Amino acid sequence: MVGIIVVFPNKDNATNIRNLLVRAGLNVTGVCTTGAQAMNYADSVDEGIIVCGYKLKDMMYSELREYLPDRFEMLLIASQGKWEEGLASGVMGLTMPIKAYDLMNTLQMMLQ
């Protein structure tokens, strides 16, 4: 089962993104504020996508990417300056402010 895990340090932001994804018919496995919580959710699904911000409460997005199994992809939502130098393998980026249309299209592409 492919799961989507939403991870942002601000719980309200994470919940708003989850609500947007659920309204679009996507299966959201979990919403959390730390990388450790995201890894716990990741253990419960076969593969998935982590939708996250640049800096979580307990680690940076790059640390979380290192800890996740290869069967997970990551969608980083951050300002362009945060990822100008390039992104690690398995990480896609969307710039803030984010548009719902761009988020949905990117996730649909990642799910195929």
What are these regions (language model features)?
Residues 14, 35, 48-69, 80-82:
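Conserved phosphotransfer microenvironments
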Residues 31-49:
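Acidic, metal-coordinating helix/loop segments flanking the phosphotransfer/catalytic sites
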Residues 63, 78-96, 105:
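Alpha4 helix (beta4-alpha4-beta5 surface) of REC/receiver domains from two-component response regulators
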Residues 70-75:
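A short helix->loop->beta-strand "cap" motif at the edges of active sites that frequently abuts
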Residues 98-111:
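C-terminal output helix
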Residues 11-30:
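Two-component/phosphorelay signaling modules centered on CheY-like receiver
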Residues 8:
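Conserved acidic carboxylate
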